[in-house]
């Protein structure tokens, strides 16, 4: 494989020097330079050597491109149509997102109860190498470059690949650093909230113990103590709720960070393994610190639960004892326990005292029996608790051992990946050195071949250029004539359309004038009809002179309208006519009288007689 890669280096270096603008065709130049005496043998040897050289170079290039994706990317960028060849032989290239990244030195993130996250100043950045690779921009007809320029490009192409790889690695490191900073900030806040919850739980337990121990205090002091206990309980609930919310948020951030690390692993970026390993170590430290502080909160809550149960049992025992005393001495005023002995001397009788003493003896015997039974029971409970504790400690020990083994395996894997990366870099450097040497050894031969190709391509280019120019000139004249004809046709069409628009506008104006006159006539007739319908109380008749005059004015050029208005009697114009309302009212009056007349029979009798 190394020999094939060395052979491929010549082709890749030569083609990368010329930016992939020319194709190597060694047979024709060799035939032109061959002498007449040994043309057959020399041509066959050169043809065979050329085919072997080109085939070995292409095969070695494909094999090395399959092993190194960055080398494949550089060849695809430098040599045209090489991406299609790689796609047919090797398939599609793995996709890598070129994000800006800054390489950082890996370091463990130590988070204590007040965790501190390493900032940018604590994570020194590696200096990125500046890329000085010139962008190839030679055209098809440019002369072949000199040997010195080829060597320069051969030297700078690896630097360009190195700079691209460093750029991608730096972007990955920057993204991991930002995600770690955010996760560490949330974890630190969560740890602070958990510690505050522990302090609140301990404060509540302490105040509750104090209030239960000082049972002899009565009055306002006792009330103040219980108010303090209630306040501590509220603070405890608030702190525990805040700690739970912060813990959920921290778990979400840790899951996001874990997803980011897994995505970075899947991308398989060269040189990114140290940063991914450092991020995993810091994430593991955060998880361990968070678990420890959560265990502290759980332990504090367990202790507080025991104190609360103890308080409930004490309160229940006091209530039971008070009920027993009330049943023994029902005549004594409640609350006698707070009285002094001198006050109780005249209150309790001999029978009451004997009853209290007898009850105290029975109670002591009962408590002694319960104490003995409790001791035996607790002994069994202690044995069971010890067994459970041993099992829990064994499980915790197994879990701790598993975590330690996992951490150790991750460290070994990281070290192995680091060594593999170093060996890979050394192999790449050696391969690039061999490629440069092979390219320098065959530069003279390539220069001669490329000069011949340059002359051929220049001749072909000039011939194609003259043909294309003549075709373009003919095409230009044809398109100019077509545009002139189309322009003339468009002008004629627009002129005809303009004439049609003018005629349509004139006819529309005449129609609008006729419609306006008809509308005025209609309005005048409607006014006349309205005046004939309505009337006022002072004037039963309505003169029609003004309405008729309006009709005459609006239709002065209409003979039919003038004849119709002239036929109206002058009395109607001056005196007026009865309106429709007046006639309707008179008709109703006449109808009423006619109805009354109809009620008179043949004998002239009616309801009025």
Curated annotation (Swiss-Prot):
Gene Ontology CC entries for this record: MICOS complex; mitochondrial inner membrane; mitochondrial intermembrane space; mitochondrion
For the modification N6-acetyllysine, which residues carry it? 174, 403
Q: Where are the Mitochondrial matrix topological domains?
A: 34-45
Question: Which GO biological process categories is it annotated with?
Answer: cristae formation; mitochondrial calcium ion homeostasis; neuron cellular homeostasis
* Sequence ranges on the Mitochondrial intermembrane membrane side: 66-609
**Coiled-coil regions listed:** 232-270, 350-397
Q: Which domain of life is it from?
A: Eukaryota
Q: Which UniProt keywords are listed? A: Acetylation, Coiled coil, Membrane, Mitochondrion, Mitochondrion inner membrane, Phosphoprotein, Transit peptide, Transmembrane, Transmembrane helix
Topological type in the membrane: Single-pass membrane protein
What InterPro entries is this protein classified in? MIC60
Tell me the first and last residues of the signal peptide. none
- Residues that the record marks as modified (Phosphoserine) are 112-113, 175, 340, 342
Pfam families to which the protein is assigned, alphabetical:
Mitofilin (PF09731)
Q: Where is this region: Disordered?
A: 127-162
Transmembrane stretches in the record are 46-65
Q: Does the keyword Transmembrane helix apply?
A: yes
**Where's it found, cell-wise?**
Mitochondrion inner membrane; Mitochondrion
Q: Where is the transit peptide?
A: 1-33
Q: Give the main location.
A: mitochondrion
- Function of the protein: Component of the MICOS complex, a large protein complex of the mitochondrial inner membrane that plays crucial roles in the maintenance of crista junctions, inner membrane architecture, and formation of contact sites to the outer membrane. Plays an important role in the maintenance of the MICOS complex stability and the mitochondrial cristae morphology.
Describe, as the record does, how this protein assembles with itself and its partners.
Component of the mitochondrial contact site and cristae organizing system (MICOS) complex, composed of at least MICOS10/MIC10, CHCHD3/MIC19, CHCHD6/MIC25, APOOL/MIC27, IMMT/MIC60, APOO/MIC23/MIC26 and MICOS13/MIC13. This complex was also known under the names MINOS or MitOS complex. The MICOS complex associates with mitochondrial outer membrane proteins SAMM50, MTX1 and MTX2 (together described as components of the mitochondrial outer membrane sorting assembly machinery (SAM) complex) and DNAJC11, mitochondrial inner membrane protein TMEM11 and with HSPA9.
Give the protein family: Belongs to the MICOS complex subunit Mic60 family.
Kindly provide the name given to this protein in its UniProt entry.
Answer: MICOS complex subunit Mic60
Q: Which species does the entry assign this protein to? A: Rattus norvegicus
* Gene that specifies this protein: Immt
